[in-house]
């Protein structure tokens, strides 16, 4: 069944005006030329072409993804003629989306990560690092952390909350990932919550533990802030640290506690062999990393 929809005079006039504007449009003229089409093509496909021009015009003065007004963020409408001569619409990444994809390409090297999307954009050469490095205390921590990259031993970065420890370690992670190393960035308190939530899912736990054991580079962020039990200490952290120490795998830590304070944190009251278990954890942390203090005011 065919439908013949009759336009009003006003609608006919508007359509004719739109077609006239389309024929004069530089983008339409270029499209016709590239595809060896004549003006009749505009008349037959005016609706699609009009929407395409609106999309192209919206992108023309765009300042970036944060200002995108397209239906799908970062995607521009494109047109092509298929082998049968029919006009097809499709979406393609705009220049800003392509740039963002390039900036995030190293994300595929992360085996396990609690980093946000914007965290993957952190670069050790960012102005934020360079400005912060003007502060004497931050410069020392930044320099020692970056200097650890070619060495076997990582860094145990400790200090008060908000001094920029996690931010610096995320930059370190991105550096390794961009240099083709497998990386895991783990917020220890969040990790423990997730493992408790999936306590009965042995497959999930084993998969996560393997990521932590075997990533080329591991960052244990905010260690000591988790809800500490014998299970979290002896069944989660110790096997990971033991594996990485034995295989001399690059490991970093951030904490609000010094190593000495962390040792006290892991001594659980009224539990057998507490001192020995705590010492075993700290022995591995000391073997895997060098303590570096990041003091100063909060940078949040």
Give the predicted meaning of each segment.
Residues 196, 200-249:
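Conserved nucleotide-sensing/catalytic segment adjacent to the nucleotide-binding pocket
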Residues 119-148:
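N-terminal pre-Walker A segment at the start of P-loop NTPase domains
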Residues 59-115:
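Interdomain "pre-motor" coupling segment immediately N-terminal to P-loop NTPase/helicase cores
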Residues 149-169:
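Walker A/P-loop nucleotide-binding motif
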Residues 1-51, 55-59:
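Intrinsically disordered, low-complexity N-terminal extensions of AAA+/P-loop NTPases
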Residues 174-185:
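Post-Walker A helix-loop "phosphate-sensing" segment adjacent to the P-loop in P-loop NTPases
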Residues 185-191:
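A short hydrophobic beta-strand->loop->alpha-helix junction that borders the nucleotide-binding pocket
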């Amino acid at each position: 069944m065919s439908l013949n929809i009759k336009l009003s005079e006003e609608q006919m006039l508007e359509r004719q005006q739109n077609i006239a504007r389309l024929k004069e449009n530089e983008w339409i003229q270029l499209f016709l030329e590239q595809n060896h089409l004549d003006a009749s093509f505009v008349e037959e496909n005016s609706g699609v072409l009009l929407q395409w021009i609106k999309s192209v015009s919206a992108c023309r003065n765009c300042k970036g993804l944060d200002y995108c007004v397209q239906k799908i963020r970062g995607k521009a409408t494109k047109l092509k003629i298929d082998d049968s001569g029919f006009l097809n619409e499709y979406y393609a990444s705009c220049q800003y989306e392509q740039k963002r994809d390039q900036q995030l390409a190293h994300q595929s090297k992360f085996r396990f990560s609690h980093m946000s999307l914007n965290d993957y954009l952190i670069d050790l050469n960012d102005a934020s690092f360079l400005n912060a490095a003007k502060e004497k205390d931050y410069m020392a921590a930044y320099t020692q952390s970056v200097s650890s990259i070619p060495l076997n031993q990582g860094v145990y970065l400790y200090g008060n909350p908000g001094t920029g420890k996690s931010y610096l370690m995320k930059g370190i992670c991105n550096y390794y990932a961009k240099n083709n190393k497998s990386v895991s960035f783990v917020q220890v308190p969040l990790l423990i919550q997730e493992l408790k939530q999936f306590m009965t899912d042995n497959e999930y736990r084993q998969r996560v533990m393997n990521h932590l054991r075997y990533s080329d580079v591991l960052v244990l962020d905010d260690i000591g802030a988790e809800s500490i039990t014998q299970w979290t200490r002896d069944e989660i952290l110790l096997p990971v640290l033991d594996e990485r120490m034995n295989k001399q795998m690059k490991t970093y830590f951030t904490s609000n506690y010094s190593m000495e304070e962390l040792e006290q944190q892991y001594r659980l009251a009224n539990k057998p062999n507490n001192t020995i278990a705590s010492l075993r954890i700290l022995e591995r942390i000391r073997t895997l990393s060098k303590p570096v203090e990041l003091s100063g005011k909060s940078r949040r």
